[in-house]
Amino acid sequence: MKAAVLHRYDETLSAKEFVSFEDVVDPRIENPTDVIVRIGGAGVCRTDLHIVEGIWREKSNVNLPYIMGHENAGWIEEAGKGVTGFKKGDPVICHPLVTSGHCLACRRGDDMHAEESVFPGINANGGYAQVLLTGARSLIKLPKTLAPKDVAPYTDAGLTAYRAAKKASRHLLPGQYAVIIGAGGLGHIGIQVLKALCAAEIIVIDRAPGALELALSCGAHHVVKADGDEVEAVLSLTGGHGAEAVIDFVGEGDAIAKGLTMTRNAGFYYIVGYGGRIDIPTIDMITSEKTIVGNLVGTYAELVELMALADRGLVDLKTREYPLSAANDALHDLHHGRVPGRAVLIP
C-alpha cells in the first residue's frame, strides 16, 4: 500500500518534506478482533507536527520509520474471526484508542485511561495510508448522511472539543457566559457543541480575522480579537465578573494566564491546548475557588454522541482536502496557519 512515512524528527520544522510518500507492507489481521479499515479520510492534527518535532518521542516510544495519522474514518476492508456486527464495505469512524475492554477503566467507559491500549498514529502505525489496522471495539458505524472524508477529524479534534464543551455545559445556565480561546480546528467545533448543549452566551477569542468570522458563522455571540486587550474586553462583556467557563484550545503563551483571569470566581477553566505551564499562587486558587480541568480526547460513548449531533446537522466540520501524496503540503499549511478548520488526507 501507499503511505506517508515519517523517517526522522525535525525539531525546527524547517525541512521541505516531513514525510516520504512510498510503498509499505500492508497490515495483516493477527487477532480475532482486529479490523482493517480502508481509509476514506485521515485528519491532519497539530499533534502530528509535535510528533515530527520529537515532542512525543519518549511518550509514544515508537521506532522510526512509522506512519502518523490518528484521526481516521473509512470502510471495513477485512475483519478477524471474532468480529461481529460489521461487514466489508460498512462505513465507520475509528475511536482513536484501541483497547481490550477488560480493565477497570475500560469497564467504566474511561477509554482514554485504559491500562493497556494502542493509539494508531501515536504509538503504532496510523492512517496516513491506504489502509489501517485497528480493533472492532473502536469502530462506530456511520449513518448514510456522513461520509468518512467529512468526519475523520471528529475522532480526535472533534471528540476532544466535544468532551471539554460537554463538561462546561453542565455548569452553564441561560444568561451565563462561556469563553472559547482559539477558533481553529478544535475551537470551531467547541462553539457548535456548546451552542447545541446549552444556552450560555459564547465569547470567542482569536488573533486571526478569518477565525473570528468562522466563529460567528458557528454560532458565537461575541468575538474578541487577541490584540493584548482581550481580558478587558471579556470583563466588559461579562459585567466585570468574567465567564463561568473558559475553554482554552491554545494552552501556551499568555493564553493560560489570561484565560484564568477571564474565569470568574468559582468558575471553571478547561485546558485543552498544550505547550505551556500553569503557574498560579495557591492562595489565589483558594480565595477564588476556581477549578482547573484537564481534557484528554473523549470516550467511545462521547464519539457516538458527537456523531448524533453531526447527523442532525447541529455540528458541521470545516475541512480542506489534500491527496495523501500531498501530506507534506497539508503539514506545512497547518504549521503556517493556512488551514481553516481541519486538513484531511484522501488516499
Report each predicted region and the residues it spans.
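Mid-domain Rossmann-like dinucleotide-binding core that forms the NAD(H)/NADP(H) cofactor-binding site
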Residues: 144-228, 232-233
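C-terminal hydrophobic helical "lid"/dimerization subdomain
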Residues: 257-261, 300-347
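Local beta-strand N-terminus motif with an aromatic residue
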Residues: 89, 175, 220, 242-243, ...
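Rossmann-fold dehydrogenase core element
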Residues: 268-270, 280-320
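Residues in the short beta-alpha loop(s) of Rossmann-like NAD(P)-binding domains
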Residues: 208, 275, 298
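Glycine-rich cofactor phosphate-binding loops and adjacent beta1-alpha1 units
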Residues: 169-174, 212-291
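Glycine-rich beta-strand-centered segment in the early N-terminal region that forms part
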Residues: 25-42, 56-104, 138, 143-146
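NAD(P)H dinucleotide-binding glycine-rich loop of Rossmann-like/cofactor-binding domains
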Residues: 100-181
